[in-house]
């Protein structure tokens, strides 16, 4: 698939997270080293061994409940290693539907099991750093601080 995209669009960045599981194809399957939820030590180990490719955390800092602790450990790597490109927080936004509550008549956000659907992931869809209505969660304060967006 990488060959197809490179032929159609030579400037396209191709990412395949699974390449770290099988190094036989690393030279021609992905343009970056990428992992999900790799601990900072593993990221550092890769970056200190003369890497051929930049490193991107395709998922990190899952924000279910109060779980952005340890973000500083990843942010510190940005200033230490030129080939560390940071990562993507999972999820950015809660996944919910705005519906009218049948009892109060007010608009409410519902997700995972609120519609009597089974099986369900329950609140697992509510793991963003902003709510589904686009208002910020408390975790956004920490993200802004470490990303340098504080006002």
Regions found by a protein language model. Give the residues of each.
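Active-site neighborhood of glycoside hydrolase catalytic domains
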Residues: 1-53, 80
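Substrate-binding clefts and catalytic carboxylate motifs of secreted carbohydrate-active enzymes
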Residues: 30, 42, 46-151
């Amino acid at each position: 698939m990488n060959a197809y995209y490179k032929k159609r669009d030579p400037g396209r960045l191709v990412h395949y997270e699974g390449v770290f599981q099988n190094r036989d194809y690393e030279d021609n399957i992905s343009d970056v080293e990428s992992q999900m939820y790799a601990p900072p030590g593993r990221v550092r180990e890769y970056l200190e061994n003369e890497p051929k490719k930049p490193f991107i955390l395709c998922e990190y800092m899952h924000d279910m409940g109060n779980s952005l602790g340890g973000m500083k450990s990843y942010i510190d790597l940005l200033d230490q290693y030129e080939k560390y490109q940071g990562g993507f927080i999972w999820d950015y936004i809660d996944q919910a539907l705005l519906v009218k509550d049948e009892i109060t008549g007010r608009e409410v956000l519902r997700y995972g099991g609120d519609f009597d659907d089974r099986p369900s992931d329950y609140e697992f869809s509510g793991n963003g750093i902003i709510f589904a209505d686009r208002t910020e969660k408390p975790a956004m304060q920490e993200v802004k601080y470490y990303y340098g967006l504080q006002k």
